[in-house]
């Protein structure tokens, strides 16, 4: 992936991919998405979907190629190619797509690679559609000559950094590698990971790149999807103009379906440098995507592990108390599928005991089967899930492309839902017996380093390749070398960027507001695009209301509130929520406790009645309290070993001071959580939860009158009390910079958190400072930090900077993860960029900043989530409903001189905390060269 962003690729990726909601089973909605499809003479499939709700369009280019089409010894190539395709093309120029995206106010060019496909997608204001089609065509037809050896060598480092960040430097990162190596034969294309191996990535040559492109990136292997507010007649003409002359490639034969083979059960173990809890994973070969049995397998895995009625929950979590949760899913790809079961046990639990409990849970299922009631409950979430997938044109475009690529039917997702709704109890039992019961499997035990005795008996050591840290192991690449190449001919001058279309008319949503008699303020936006209602009740306080010596009370209270009510057992409450097509979650953060709800509009009142029960009639179940405590302790233990989590926690301690409640993790510590009693939760609830400090944000297919009427019960029953949320002072910035180092032995990446206590969101300079930061590190691939550290040097997979104030000053932060052996060099480069930012900021930078921040307003209110965020800003900070327009005027009035003034005021490399989390043995001594004295070691 280009960025760490997940995109919904199907209405039903897997029932196990998200919490199961529910609908009334007697409802029979249409799951059809309207589309138009045509094919150019060169074989390019084009799919259009019209959505007039917002002045935006999503453009999605999907190639039917992933890691399954790679050659042995060149693993990771499809994914690396995804990276290369963003860098340059003949007419866009170097970094042209990212520069274009910034200028037109796009969401940012993004992409992802799977085993079987690679996609490139972005949402833009609809006046830029022709520009995007021109750009995507340039990538497909006028790209390959721009790839040179220096370009390839630099991007290898970026991809290797992505692997370090997502696989090598995180707990359990190598699990799937071990599973797939055993599940599929060596010559099976699913035997290796999409990210590939570091050795294979380094071995890739320029000839490999060109061969791969010419074989797979041809029109007859690509689908172009456009979804949003546009003229399809005009768009078709543009598609024909820009894509039509790209030559068709050789015909591509489909690969044969080839399920995994496990001739005998095999068990492996690995002592994980970052794991603090033992984890058992079991995997069985199953079926490929769209296989008739895949839908019953998804129902099976959901029933076995999700919810209070699940056999695995009852045995492993409630009875044996071996783990806080169990996860099982059926994952289908184009050629084969696999069913996996994962149990991350509590500290020091033997995985043999977990395996015995798994057998007991399977036996329970064999005895009891699945009831019609449970089957209906699992199916019930499909309507809500479907409508949630329609919340953005980007999601729709990806969904349509997925269906076209793999089923030759853009609307195939609707057939998948019908297939799920047709699954019977007999089907569920049959697929269990066919694919799971008594069948050979692969098992992995990932245990903390030094605790091999926790692994499953009979396990052999897994062969995991772990990268050594060697200074100077990678050659530096000059990013300024210009490629010399012969231009690819065209029938017209493609170097001329198309003009904008008609300027989009951005309509700010109409906001209604009402204060209830009990003091709660309600803010709403009617949104009738889909028949859903989404809302959140935000109760100010959260961590800020806690005793610093017993942190974690608010979090435990929030988690316990959904574990039953005075009227309903935990299982009964869960079932009632699911039967309404709803999800209800309660969480606690630093500044608030938040109830988040998603439901079908027709079930709004019934869902709200359950919210009332949860909020006003907590069960305070002692058994569930102990389970929640155990799960929280397990979560804390794991966070303590994650370098990114460590960096965030230690940075907060530097920013706020160790004695400030704001420096603490809302989860608490192992010691504080173990000391908390049920009476502590009751006392916190009684003292701090009041409508007088509550706000409700509601977006959905419901008008103000109905919404307010539905709140009559909550208005009457929830009595106000006097609650004062303390104001915790933020310290002043440091008077001089200092380097702080937290040691994670063997870390192959160093995690950076550089910054200082900065501004409150209510400060008059706050939004201007955000504008100032756009080119520094807030603009993604348009930012200097990304262009220098990732695109120029290949030091990192990603880096950003931001201001994160609330009602009180919050930090300015520069965050990244860099390969360990350039820790000093990367920090020096960041320091140089910050120091020189005022004088280097140019008129072109200002134009890019203005263009993005103004034009991106066309996307500002597209999704329900965006509208909820708008209401949050209004209710929390007292902003006007048209604050977006007010901010637009600030941007229009910005000058280079003002940016330089702001950067001089709020960017001072000499008054920051410079925190590094990494391998002290190899990196700590070098950091004195950063010029801030001897580093302070934190552990």
Regions found by a protein language model. Give the residues of each.
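Metal-associated gating/positioning segment near the N- to mid-region
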Residues: 84-92, 99
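Non-catalytic, conformational "gating/processing" segments within enzyme and secreted inhibitor domains
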Residues: 149, 156, 210-242, 440, ...
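Proteolytic maturation boundary segments
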Residues: 19-46, 231-272, 279, 314, ...
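Bacterial N-terminal signal peptides
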Residues: 6-16
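Short, conserved secondary-structure transition motifs
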Residues: 159-166, 258-271, 378-389, 599-600, ...
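Positively charged n-region of N-terminal signal peptides that target proteins for export
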Residues: 1-4
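M16 family metallopeptidases and their MPP-like homologs
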Residues: 47-49, 54-72, 76-80, 95-142, ...
């Amino acid at each position: 992936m280009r960025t760490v962003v997940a995109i919904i690729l199907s209405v039903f990726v897997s029932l196990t991919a998200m919490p199961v909601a529910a609908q009334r089973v007697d409802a029979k909605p249409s799951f059809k998405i309207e589309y138009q499809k045509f094919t150019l003479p060169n074989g390019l499939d084009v799919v259009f979907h019209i959505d007039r709700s917002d002045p935006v369009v999503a453009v999605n280019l999907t190639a039917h190629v992933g890691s399954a089409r790679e050659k042995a010894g060149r693993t990771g190539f499809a994914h690396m190619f995804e990276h290369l395709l963003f860098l340059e093309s003949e007419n866009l120029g170097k970094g042209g797509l990212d520069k274009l995206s910034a200028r037109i106010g796009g969401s940012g060019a993004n992409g992802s690679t799977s085993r079987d496909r690679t996609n490139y997608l972005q949402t833009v204001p609809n006046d830029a559609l022709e520009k995007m089609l021109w750009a995507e065509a340039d990538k497909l037809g006028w790209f390959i000559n721009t790839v040179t050896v220096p370009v390839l060598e630099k991007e290898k480092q970026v991809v290797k950094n992505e692997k370090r960040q997502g696989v090598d430097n995180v707990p359990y990162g190598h699990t799937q590698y071990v599973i797939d190596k055993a599940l599929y034969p060596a010559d099976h294309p699913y035997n290796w990971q999409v990210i590939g191996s570091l050795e294979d990535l380094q071995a890739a040559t320029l000839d490999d790149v060109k061969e791969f492109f010419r074989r797979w990136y041809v029109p007859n292997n690509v689908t172009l999807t456009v979804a949003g507010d546009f003229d399809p007649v005009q768009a078709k003409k543009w598609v024909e103009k820009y894509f039509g002359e790209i030559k068709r490639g050789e015909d591509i034969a489909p690969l044969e379906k080839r399920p995994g083979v496990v001739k005998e059960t095999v068990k492996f173990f690995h002592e994980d440098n970052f794991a603090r809890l033992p984890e058992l994973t079991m995997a069985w070969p199953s079926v490929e995507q769209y296989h008739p049995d895949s839908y019953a397998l998804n129902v099976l895995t959901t029933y076995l592990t999700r919810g209070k009625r699940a056999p695995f929950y009852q045995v492993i979590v409630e009875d044996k108390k071996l783990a806080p949760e169990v996860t099982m899913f059926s994952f289908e790809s184009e050629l084969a599928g696999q069913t996996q079961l994962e149990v991350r046990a509590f500290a020091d639990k033997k995985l043999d005991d977990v395996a015995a409990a798994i057998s007991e849970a399977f036996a329970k299922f064999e005895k009891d089967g699945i009831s019609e009631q449970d089957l209906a409950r699992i199916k019930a979430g499909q309507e809500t899930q479907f409508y949630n997938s329609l919340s953005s044109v980007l999601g729709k475009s990806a969904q349509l492309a997925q269906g076209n690529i793999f089923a030759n039917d853009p609307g195939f997702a609707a057939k998948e839902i019908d297939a799920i709704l047709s699954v019977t109890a007999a089907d569920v039992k049959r697929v269990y017996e066919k694919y799971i019961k008594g069948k050979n499997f692969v098992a992995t035990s990932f245990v903390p380093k030094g605790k091999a005795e926790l692994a499953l008996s009979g396990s052999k050591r897994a062969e995991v390749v772990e990268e050594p840290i060697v200074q100077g192991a990678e050659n530096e690449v000059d990013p300024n070398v210009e490629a010399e190449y012969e231009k690819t001919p065209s029938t017209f001058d493609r170097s001329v960027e198309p003009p904008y279309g008609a300027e989009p008319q951005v309509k700010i949503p109409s906001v209604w507001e009402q204060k209830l008699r009990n003091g709660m303020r309600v803010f709403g936006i009617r949104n009738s695009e889909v028949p859903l209602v989404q809302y959140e009740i935000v109760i100010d306080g959260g961590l800020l209301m806690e005793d610093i010596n017993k942190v974690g009370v608010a979090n435990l209270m929030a988690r316990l509130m959904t574990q039953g009510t005075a009227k309903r057992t935990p299982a009964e409450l869960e079932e009632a929520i699911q039967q309404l097509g709803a999800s209800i979650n309660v969480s606690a953060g630093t500044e608030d406790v938040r109830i988040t709800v998603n439901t079908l509009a027709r079930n709004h009142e019934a869902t709200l009645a359950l919210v009332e029960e949860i909020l006003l009639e907590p069960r305070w179940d002692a058994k569930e309290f102990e389970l929640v405590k155990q799960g929280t302790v397990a979560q804390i233990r794991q966070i303590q070993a994650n370098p990114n989590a460590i960096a965030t926690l230690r940075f907060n301690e530097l920013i706020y001071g160790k004695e400030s409640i704001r420096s603490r993790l809302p989860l608490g510590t192992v010691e504080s959580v173990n000391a908390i009693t049920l009476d502590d939760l009751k006392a916190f609830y009684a003292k701090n939860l009041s409508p007088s400090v509550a706000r409700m944000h509601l977006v959905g297919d419901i008008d103000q009158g109905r919404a307010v009427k539905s709140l009559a019960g909550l208005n009457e029953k929830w009595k106000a009390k006097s609650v004062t949320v303390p104001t915790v002072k933020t310290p002043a910035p440091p008077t001089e910079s200092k380097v702080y180092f937290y040691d994670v032995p063997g870390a192959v990446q160093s995690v950076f958190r550089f910054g200082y206590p900065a501004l409150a969101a209510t400060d008059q300079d706050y939004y201007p400072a955000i504008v100032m930061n756009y080119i520094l590190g807030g603009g993604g691939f348009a930012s200097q930090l990304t262009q220098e550290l990732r695109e120029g040097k290949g030091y990192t997979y990603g880096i950003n900077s931001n201001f994160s104030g609330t009602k009180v000053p919050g930090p300015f932060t520069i965050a990244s993860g860099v390969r360990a052996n350039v820790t000093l060099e990367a920090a020096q480069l960041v320091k140089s960029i910050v120091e020189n930012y005022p004088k280097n900021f140019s008129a072109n930078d200002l134009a890019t900043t203005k263009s993005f921040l103004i034009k991106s307003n066309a996307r500002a209110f597209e999704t329900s989530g965006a509208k909820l965020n708008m209401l949050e800003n209004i209710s929390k900070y007292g902003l006007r409903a048209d604050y977006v327009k007010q901010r637009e005027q600030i941007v229009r009035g910005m000058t280079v001189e003002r940016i330089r003034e702001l950067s001089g005021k709020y960017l001072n490399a000499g008054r920051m905390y410079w925190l590094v989390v990494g391998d002290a043995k190899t990196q700590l001594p070098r950091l004195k060269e950063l010029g801030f004295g001897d580093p302070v070691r934190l552990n």
